[in-house]
Structure formats: C-alpha cells, structure tokens
Amino acid sequence: MSAPKPTRSQGDLAEMLEMLLDKGVVINADIAVSIGDTELLGIELRAAVASFETAAQYGLEFPTGTDMERVEEAAGISPDESRSLDTRSESEQMDELPGEAGASVSNTAPQEEE
C-alpha cells in the first residue's frame, strides 16, 4: 500500500480568503537593529487587511481617492454613521476588534531615556 498524499482543493483557499477578509487581520511590528546603545535601524509596521465592509465597520482609515459612497454601500451604513465612526478615538475603535486583535494593536515603540 502506498502512503496517502496530501491534497489541496481550490475551495479551501477561497474559504480562507473569505474568512480573512470577513474577520480582518491586524499586523503590528516594531523592529530595531542596535549595536551597543546606538540604534542603527528602526521600523514600525502597522497594517490591516480586511474587506471594505469589515474595515468600514471598525472605522479604519481608507487611502485618499477611495470612493467612500461605495464603501458605505458595501458596509450597509449611512453617511451619518460613517461620520460618527470617524469621530471615535482610536482606542475606542480597537476595543471593538474581536478576540485579542484589539489588545495587540497598541503603540509599543520604545521610549527614549532622558
């Protein structure tokens, strides 16, 4: 008997992408390269991947030039609701993220000593 071979179906990839866009993913990374006390390179990465609908529900900022009417239509919210999303603080928006995603998005940049 031969060993079973793993198979991949296109449905799995499509389901994974649908879940990713439906739930959204937030990436928060701080990278520092130092020698001794001298920091040579510092990178702060903040990225969010989500569908327009999910991003609009959480009040994430959209790039300039985005057709906001289409975003509001996709999210099923009125223009008044989208304005109220913009007025909430970032911490209020992050508190609404499901699971630990809201807790993991914070400003963790190292503080300079005086």
Swiss-Prot record:
Coiled coil: none annotated. Residues 104-114 have a biased composition (Polar residues). Pfam families: Gas_vesicle. Residues 63-114 are annotated as: Disordered. GO terms for molecular function: structural molecule activity. Disulfide bonds: none annotated. It is found in: Gas vesicle. GO terms for cellular component: gas vesicle; vesicle membrane. The keyword Kinase does not apply. Induction: Transcribed from early-log phase, decreases as cells enter stationary phase, probably as a long gvpF-gvpM RNA. Highly expressed in 25% salt, poorly expressed in 15% salt, no gas vesicles are formed at 15% salt. Belongs to the gas vesicle GvpA family. GvpF to GvpM interact with each other in vitro, and may form multi-subunit complex(es). Interacts with GvpA. Encoded in a 14-gene locus called mc-vac. A minor component of the gas vesicle, proteins GvpF to GvpM might be involved in nucleating gas vesicle formation. Gas vesicles are hollow, gas filled proteinaceous nanostructures found in some microorganisms. They allow positioning of halobacteria at the optimal depth for growth in the poorly aerated, shallow brine pools of their habitat. Expression of a 9.5 kb mc-vac DNA fragment containing 2 divergently transcribed regions (gvpD-gvpE-gvpF-gvpG-gvpH-gvpI-gvpJ-gvpK-gvpL-gvpM and gvpA-gvpC-gvpN-gvpO) allows H.volcanii to produce gas vesicles. This is Gas vesicle protein J.
